[in-house]
Every structure is written in C-alpha cells, then in structure tokens.
C-alpha cells in the first residue's frame, strides 16, 4: 500500500500527524496518593491535583470525575482539582470496618483545548483512637472443676474495640495480682483475638467454692482507653471423697421379738463431704444379705434408718447378719460397706388374736362402710410380755347398724385364736361397753355380736365397745380390742322449729324483696333425713282471697322470708304466714310454724278536707254582717287514713287579709270570729289560708283558700258551698269553755271495752274474797260464843233461826255439824306454844245440797287448828229440817288411824253387811239393806252414862236414843281457847289412844261400795293435835277398805242417863 493511499491526500498529512501526537499525549496517565485522618471536619483540604501534577491551568481547564462518586465524602473542584472532605465527613470504621488499610480510589479527568489528562487518585483514611474496648457483658460467670489440672485454659469472651492497629485492643488482664488465675490474650492466624483464663494452681472446693475477680481490657491509643467487667469463677465439686459410717465396719444391735413393726434398729448415717450428687449417699443391702432378712428389715435408701418391717420370731431364728453398702451418686461413685448383726431377744409373745368381721349390708357396694368393715382382715393381738391383768390395745373395727334393727339382730362375727397350745391356747372372750349389745357363743373360738335392745341414733349415735380375749396361761395374756358400732340413721324425726310462732314487724311501703325474718328448724337426723327445706303453706289473705305466696316468699334452703310486694297498713295490718319445714327423707316428715307479720303504720297519707267540700282548692263561707265576736262561723272537717299520731289533725288559719278577723280551733276545726263585723259593708271579703297538718314525722299538710263573705242580715253563718248545717253553730252563739272533742275510733273503743271487762273481773274477785273472809269471821265468832256458854243443856241460848243469830251469821244450816273434841293424850301441857297457837285462816266453798235438805247449796267450811285437845266434851249439832224426827246425834268411828264422824240420820244409809254383789271382805256374805245393821254392829260395848243403852240393847239391838250424844249437864271445864277448827282438805293421821277408851273393839266391816249421800268427818292428828273435816254428802264412789273401828267410851253424867240435847240449845257452825 502506498503512503498516499495509506494516509490519504498529501495535504492532510500534517494534520493527521498532529492528532496522533495529541492522542498519544492524552493517553498518558498518573496516580496521585493522598492521606487524611478520619473524623476530619467537612471542607478540610486533602490536596490539589493541578499543583501536585505541575499542570498549567488555563481558563478553559476543567477537572471532573470519570464516574459518579459520593460527593458527601469527597469533593473535587473543577478549576484546579482541589480535593476536600465532604459534608458527611469520613468515618473509617463505617467505611472499612476492621480492615488494616482504608483507601478511597477514583479517577479524575483534566481536559482543556490543548490537552486531555486522566489522573488516578487514591485517598487513604487513617484511624484515630475514638473507641474504647467494650465487654459483651458486665458479669461474666465461669465454672471450673476442682479436679482441673494446672494450666487448664478456660475461654473467655473477648472485649470488642472498633479501632484497628495500635488503637485497637492490646491487652486483657486481672485486677487481682494474687489469684490462682491469669488471663492471656492471643491473636489467631486469621487475625482475630481470643482471651483465655489460665489455671495457675490446684483448686479445692471444700476450702473455697468460688472466686470473684475483675477483668481489665486496654487499647494502645494515646492516651489509652480501657474497660472492666466482673468475673465470677465457681469451683465445681469433684467426687473426691468416699462415704464413712460412724459405727465403723461392724455394728451390732439387739431387738426384742415383740417389737412392733416400724421400730428403729439403727441409724446408719454415713456422711460424704462432697457436694450435690457427689455427696448424696444411697444405702442398699449388699448382695450377701439373704432374702428373708430383706423382708423383715427395711433400710431407708435416703436416710440409712434400719427399721423393722415384719414380725420376727425368736423360736424361728435368733440372729440376722445384714450387709449395708453406702454409695454416692457422683461420676465414678465411691462406696463404703458396714456389716450389721441383729440379735433377737426372746419374750412371751403369744397373746390371743381377735378377728372382727362386721355384717355386710345386702347389696352394699364395695366402697360402702358395710363392705369396708366386712373386708377387714383378722387383726391379731401383738405379742406382749405382760403380767396377769395386762393386755394389748388393738386397732378398732367399725360396724354400721340401722337404728330400726330389731332385738337379737346380728352385728358382727368375732373369732379368737392363740398360737400357743394347751392351757395357753384356751381363750375366753368378753364384750364390755354397753348393755345394748352382747356376745352370743357360735362355735369353738367364735362369737356373735347381737343387739340386746332397740337402738335410737338420736340418743346414742355411736357405741364404743371393748372386746377382751384372755388365755389361761400363767401369767395369762390378754388382748383388748376396741370395737365401734355406729347406728345408721333413719328418718324418724320431723323438723322442729325453734319456736312455734314468729312475730315480725315491717313498716308499710316497704320495697318489694325486703327481708322480713328467718325461720329456723332443726332435724336431728343425718344426711338427707336431716336436710331441711322450707316452703309456704298456701292460704288466702284477707277478703281479697289472694294467695299468701303473692305477698311473701321463703328461701327453701335458709328459711329467710322476703316480701314480694309493698304492704299497705290501711288495707293489710297483719299477715299470717305458715311455713312448712320438710326433711329429705323417705317418707318425708314436716312441721309447720306460724309467722305473724305485723304491718306498722307510716305517715303516707295527707289530710283530706271532707266538709265543706273545696272547689278548686278554695272555700267560700258566708258570714252575717251583724255577727259579733266569738260567733261560730263554720266547722272544718277533715280525715287522715293514717292512725295514731300520723292521723291526728291540726288546723291553722294563715295569711288573713285584710286583717285577722277569724280564728280556728286547732283540734276542733271550728272557725269563730275574733272581731266585730257590724261595721263591715255587705260583700266585704276576708281571705285566709287554711292549713291542715297531721302529727307525723315529718307532718303532711293540705291547704285551701277560704273566702269569708260578709252578707246583709242576720242569717246563719253557712259556707257558700253545699254542706251539712249540723256542723255549724247557729249565728250569735258563744263558744263554751270546753276542751277539744274526742275522736272515737275502733282501737279506742276496744281498749275501753277491755279495760271495763278487767275492772268488772277485779271487782268480782274482790267481792268473792270479801264474802269468804266474812264467813271465816262468822265461823270464828260462832266458835267463840259456844265456848263462852256453860254447856249444851244450859239455858240462855237463842233459838235456832232467831233474828240475833241470823244477824251474827250463826243461824241453823242444813247438814252442818259442830266440831267434836275428844280427850287428848296429855303429852303436851296446856300452856305449850302449840296449844296456844292462833287458829289459821278459814276458807269456804260451795257444795251441792244433800238429799232431803233444802234446795239451796250448803257451805262446807275449811277449818284448821293447832290447839291441843283440852278434855272430853261433845258439842251439839243441827240436822237438816224437814225429816219430822228429833235431830240425830253424830257417830264418831275410829278407823285405826283417824276418827270419822257420821250423822245419825245419814248413818242409817250405811250397812255393815255385804251387798251380795261379791265385793265384800271375808265373813261378810249376808246382805242388809235395812240400814239398822250399822247401828247393831258398830258398837259392841258402851259405858253407862255416855250412851243411853240398857241390857235389852244387847239382845234386841240399840234404839235411836243410843246414838244421841250426852248433853245432860253443862261442861264445867270449858276450854280456854276456841275449839279446834277443821280442814276439809287435810290428810287423816292417827290420834293418840284415848285414855278413857277401853281396849275392847268391835269388828265392823263397812261395804266398799257406798251408794248414799252422807256427811262424814275426818280427824287429823298432827303432833297430838286434831283436825276434824266437815264435808257435804259425798257423791257415789268407791271407798278404800276400812280398818278396825274402835268406839271410845266416856263416863256418864251425874244424872246417870243420857239426855238428848234440847232443840233450843243447838248451835250451828
């Protein structure tokens, strides 16, 4: 190729040569290196490319980066290529991390019209010591075994220093100079640093278990920076000790063969000073320990306590040898061995055995008390070395028997046994504790426990019995076994309320649901039988007929009663609620209680104006113009539905205009004039505010405006509205000085009626008491008059029924008898205190009249006396009129322990013979209904002068005259005191034997059945005193058997013949 062709036109060759040279010059490049420190301030000049490259800078020269670069780190000025630190500054750790060198490289192009140049720039960022070392944690725990050898290295966490080079981490050390450790800092092949804790000497945990050290890390800056951390070194235990027995290698122990199970033989407390599993010792039997010994003895693996696990028997084996091994639980466990020799000591251990098998209930589940008791094994008596009379107490067994079980019901089976033979094996058994159970022999060595009486759980719920089994050895051994019998409950008791009636008060307007009261009932039964529930017994309340359950409710579980509605006293004042308490048994038992809920009144009603009726809350009253002062104008009537103080009304007139001309009675409501209206023109109106208030707290009021209109003329002051004229006074009438009128209501009327009834009852009681007292005085006065008179036959006595006797109250009374006194025994002198005692009070009672007497009732007076018997004297009597015969004397009959006085007329009705009906005594078979048998057989012998009898009386029988008392002459020795007064209600006792009475008695048998009316008199002797009882004729009845009847004999009077008392000399009591 020719040059021309190659280079083109010859004229273009110089231009092409210039361009080639320029390109070659531009292709030349240069590397410029700068260095700066991190953390220099933004704008710091690093270098100028134009100066460092010795370039001529013209106006068109420009420096630019070849590619985009982070201008926040470095900036290049276009004019001369000056390099400065950017606004973000330079942070070597952020730009290069832990790299040994940190270089920022970039290309800068310098071009102008003359030349083009590429400059490679490298800026090295140098490190400064702006970071201190830092430990990852403030507390660094380290563990090292006490068996670790010297030189053991334990890795530690290396502190972190973000600086590099000399400013980075240079050393880590311990602050304590004298320590069994040191810290070594090493640099690995990859440049990373590591720290190790090096053990300088052997450790012993038993002497020191831990170390507390301080780590110090330091860099190489100027000045250097450092950091600290706490290093905790815990020494781990090593199994370097073996267990040790305090007893040594061989231990001997002696054990009685009757020792109970669980007895401690030996405490093998082997100790190991190591910690944790290394010092945790486990005890086991050695391989040479026989299996039988393993069953009889128990070795606690944790505590090493050797106890008795079974019953040993000296007769079977007397020595046991046990190998016990103690081993810790550390790695490479260490062991120790001890030989234990157990020697058995012989005792008399064969006591009787007792086995109790309770009777299981039919179909009882396995978990029931019946089945549990029946499944009890035979618990034999433990061997006991005891003297005669001693025994062994056993664990008891419990049986359950229903309380309704019949007598002779089977409760349990008791079996006894004894391992001994001969007399030592013969066992006797007994049951103690209660008579409701007994033992019944069943077969050899077995007994039945049966009930001996009916049971009641509420009285005795549990019986603690004792079974005693004793053998016949010498000395005998016995076994004592407690035995408990629990009585099962049956529903045989109904719930019982604490009281039959509960009284509750509640104020009216109570909120619904308010609590009223709580009723409580108790049921002594158990379980569901004693679980009480409550309910209301339905009943109708009031006239409305509503159910009581709409008023109150009762909590079935607690018995709390709550109100279901708000009560109103004006409609319901008392609510009677019956609550029924029922148990949960079958059949169910229940009982009722009455709860009386009283509703208390509250002031809940305002007064209501009744008359005159208001119109739109106002009243108008016409007042005559000629009315003067104190003239009644009107009467206001109001009512209040409340009661008591809440219903008491008060009236007031307020705000009278134009002047106060009227006043109203505060309690009467009567309006009167207080001034003169004669000068007022007709049509003049006076206005006032009527205020009606009740007495409640707070009071309720009602107001009305009253207009008083003055009218012409003198008409009646009548309110303009319609009203009853009777409520107003006539015009011109004056007010009388009377108090407020009473307001009668039902409670007040009831109170007045009750007060009047009580007054009448009290007056009747006083009248009766006064009458009885007057009769007592009359009786005492009559007795005194009789003693003042010379005798029964003396004159001067007023006739019976005379006016003076009637006035004194001593007139004749039908079927009434005077007191008969008999000679005393003379044991008490006539001046003794007992003889001078005053007579007691006398009581009177009404008794029905006797047959043949008057139709009116008779008075049977009650007398009691404490006077001694003064002498033999007989006092007259008065018989009932109308018989047409001479009054018959009374008959005194001795019944062996007391005297009986029988009227002569009534004695005819007695019979000493059998009635023929088979109710008599021996030798009393013949009947007698004539009434003379008693007269013939009552007295066998009488002294002449006392009885008017002759010799013919022994053959023909006694006449009526024989029965008359001797009253021939006056009593020359009257007693100084009133005669003894008799009691109608005292018991008869024996009298002293009469010294004048002979010892001949007549056997008179009186019939048991008395079908007659008579008056009989009992004589009561109390310390040789006598009391005679006067009674009205008895009603037909059964009399007890009579004792021997003795008749006292008295000397005849001087006349030698019995003289009947005159009619005019009789006195009545």
UniProtKB/Swiss-Prot annotation:
InterPro entries: Cadherin-like_dom, Cadherin-like_sf, Cadherin_CS, Cadherin_N, Protocadherin/Cadherin-CA. Residues 780-790, 905-920 have a biased composition (Basic and acidic residues). This is Protocadherin-8. It comes from the Eukaryota. Glycans are attached at residue 616. Keywords: Calcium, Cell adhesion, Cell membrane, Cell projection, Glycoprotein, Membrane, Phosphoprotein, Postsynaptic cell membrane, Repeat, Signal, Synapse, Transmembrane, Transmembrane helix. GO terms for biological process: cell adhesion; chemical synaptic transmission; homophilic cell adhesion via plasma membrane adhesion molecules; long-term memory; modulation of chemical synaptic transmission; morphogenesis of embryonic epithelium; regulation of synaptic membrane adhesion; somitogenesis. Gene3D superfamilies: Cadherins.
């Amino acid at each position: 190729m020719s040059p021309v062709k190659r280079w083109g036109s010859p004229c273009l060759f110089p231009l092409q040569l210039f361009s080639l040279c320029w390109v070659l010059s531009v292709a030349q490049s240069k590397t410029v290196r700068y260095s700066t420190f991190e953390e220099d301030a933004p704008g710091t000049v690093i270098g100028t490319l134009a100066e460092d490259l010795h370039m001529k800078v013209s106006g068109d020269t420009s420096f630019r980066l070849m590619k985009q670069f982070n201008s926040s780190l470095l900036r290049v000025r276009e004019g001369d290529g000056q390099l400065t630190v950017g606004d973000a500054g330079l942070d070597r750790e952020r730009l290069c991390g832990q790299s040994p060198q940190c270089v920022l490289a970039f290309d800068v192009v310098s071009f102008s019209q003359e030349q083009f140049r590429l400059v490679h720039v490298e800026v090295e960022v140098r490190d400064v010591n702006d970071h201190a070392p830092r430990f990852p944690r403030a507390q660094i725990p380290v563990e090292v075994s006490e068996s670790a050898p010297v030189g053991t290295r334990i890795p530690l966490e290396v502190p972190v220093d973000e600086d590099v080079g000399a400013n980075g981490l240079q050393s880590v050390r311990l602050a304590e100079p004298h320590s069994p450790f040191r810290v070594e800092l090493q640099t690995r092949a990859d440049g990373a640093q590591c720290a190790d804790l090096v053990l300088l000497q052997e450790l012993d945990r038993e002497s020191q278990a831990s170390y507390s050290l301080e780590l110090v890390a330091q860099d190489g800056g100027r000045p250097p920076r450092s950091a600290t951390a706490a290093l905790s070194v815990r020494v781990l235990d090593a199994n370097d000790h073996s267990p040790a027995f305090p007893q040594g290698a061989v231990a001997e122990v002696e054990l009685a063969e009757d020792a109970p199970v669980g007895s401690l033989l030996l405490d093998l407390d082997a100790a190991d000073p190591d910690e944790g599993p290394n010092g945790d010792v486990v005890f086991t039997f050695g391989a040479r320990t026989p299996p039988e010994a393993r069953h009889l003895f128990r070795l606690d693996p944790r505590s090493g306590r050797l106890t008795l696990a079974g019953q040993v028997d000296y007769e079977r084996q007397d020595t046991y040898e046990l190998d016990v091994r103690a081993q810790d639980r550390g790695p490479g466990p260490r062991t120790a061995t001890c030989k234990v020799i157990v020697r058995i000591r012989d005792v008399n251990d064969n006591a009787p055995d007792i086995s109790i098998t309770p009777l299981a209930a039919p179909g009882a589940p396995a978990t029931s008390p019946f089945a549990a008791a029946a499944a009890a094994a035979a618990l034999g008596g433990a061997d006991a070395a005891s003297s005669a009379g001693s025994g062994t107490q056993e664990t008891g067994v419990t049986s359950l028997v229903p309380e309704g079980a019949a007598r002779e019901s089977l409760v349990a089976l008791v079996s006894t046994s004894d391992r001994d033979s001969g007399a030592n094996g013969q066992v006797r058994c007994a049951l103690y504790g209660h008579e409701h159970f007994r033992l019944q022999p069943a077969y050899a060595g077995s007994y039945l426990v049966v009930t001996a009486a009916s049971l009641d759980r509420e009285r005795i719920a549990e019986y603690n019995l004792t079974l005693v089994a004793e053998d016949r050895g010498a000395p005998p051994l016995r076994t004592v076994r407690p035995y408990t019998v629990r009585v099962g409950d049956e529903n045989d008791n109904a719930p019982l309320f604490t009281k039959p009636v509960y009284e509750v008060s509640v104020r009216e307007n109570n909120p619904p649901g308010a609590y009223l009261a709580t009723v409580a009932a108790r049921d002594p039964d158990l379980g569901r039988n004693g679980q009480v529930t409550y309910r209301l017994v339905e009943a109708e309340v009031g006239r409305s007929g509503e159910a009581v359950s709409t008023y109150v409710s009762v909590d079935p579980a607690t018995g709390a009663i709550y109100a279901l509605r708000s009560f109103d006293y004006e409609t319901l004042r008392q609510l009677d609620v019956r609550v029924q308490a029922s148990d949960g048994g079958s059949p169910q038992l229940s009982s009722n209680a009455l709860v009386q809920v009283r509703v208390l009144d509250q002031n809940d009603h305002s007064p209501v104006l009744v008359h005159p009726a208001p119109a739109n809350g106002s009243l108008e009253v016409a007042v005559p113009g000629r009315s003067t002062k104190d003239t009644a104008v009107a009467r206001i009537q109001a009512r209040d539905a409340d009661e008591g103080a809440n219903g008491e009304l008060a009236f007031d007139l307020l705000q009278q205009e134009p002047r106060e001309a009227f006043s109203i009675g505060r309690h009467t409501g009567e309006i009167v004039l207080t001034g003169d209206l004669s000068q007022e023109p007709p049509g003049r109106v006076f206005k006032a505010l009527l205020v009606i208030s009740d007495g409640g707290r707070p009071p309720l009021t009602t107001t009305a405006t009253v207009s008083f209109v003055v009218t012409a003329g003198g008409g009646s002051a009548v309110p303009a509205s319609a009203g009853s004229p009777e409520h107003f006074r006539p015009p011109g009438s004056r007010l009388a000085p009377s108090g407020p009128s009473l307001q009668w209501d039902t409670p007040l009327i009831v109170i007045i009626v009750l007060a009047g009834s009580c007054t009448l009852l009290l007056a009747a009681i006083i009248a009766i008491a006064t009458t009885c007292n007057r009769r007592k005085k009359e009786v005492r006065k009559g007795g005194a008059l009789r003693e003042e008179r010379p005798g029964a036959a003396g004159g001067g006595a007023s006739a019976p029924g005379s006016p003076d006797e009637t006035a004194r109250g001593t007139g004749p009374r039908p079927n009434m008898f005077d007191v008969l006194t008999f000679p005393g025994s003379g044991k008490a002198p006539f001046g003794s205190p007992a003889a001078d005692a005053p007579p007691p009070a006398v009581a009177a009672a009404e008794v029905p009249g006797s047959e043949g007497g008057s139709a009116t009732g008779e008075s049977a007076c009650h007398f009691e006396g404490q006077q001694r018997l003064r002498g033999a004297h007989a006092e007259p009597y008065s018989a009932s009129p109308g018989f047409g015969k001479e009054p018959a004397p009374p008959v005194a009959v001795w019944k062996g322990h007391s005297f009986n006085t029988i009227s002569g007329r009534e004695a005819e009705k007695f019979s000493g013979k059998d009635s023929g009906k088979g109710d008599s005594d021996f030798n009393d078979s013949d009947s007698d209904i004539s009434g003379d048998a008693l007269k013939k057989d009552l007295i066998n012998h009488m002294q002449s002068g006392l009885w008017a009898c002759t010799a013919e009386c022994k053959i023909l029988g006694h006449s009526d005259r024989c029965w008359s008392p001797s009253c021939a002459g006056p009593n020359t020795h009257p007693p100084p005191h009133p005669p003894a007064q008799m009691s109608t209600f005292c018991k008869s006792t024996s009298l002293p034997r009469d010294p004048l009475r002979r010892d001949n008695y007549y056997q008179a048998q009186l019939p048991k059945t008395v079908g007659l009316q008579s008056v009989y008199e009992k004589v009561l002797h109390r310390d040789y005193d006598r009391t005679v009882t006067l009674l009205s004729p008895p009603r037909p009845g059964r009399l007890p058997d009579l004792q021997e009847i003795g008749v006292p004999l008295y000397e005849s009077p001087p006349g030698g013949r019995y003289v009947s008392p005159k009619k005019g000399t009789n006195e009545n009591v």
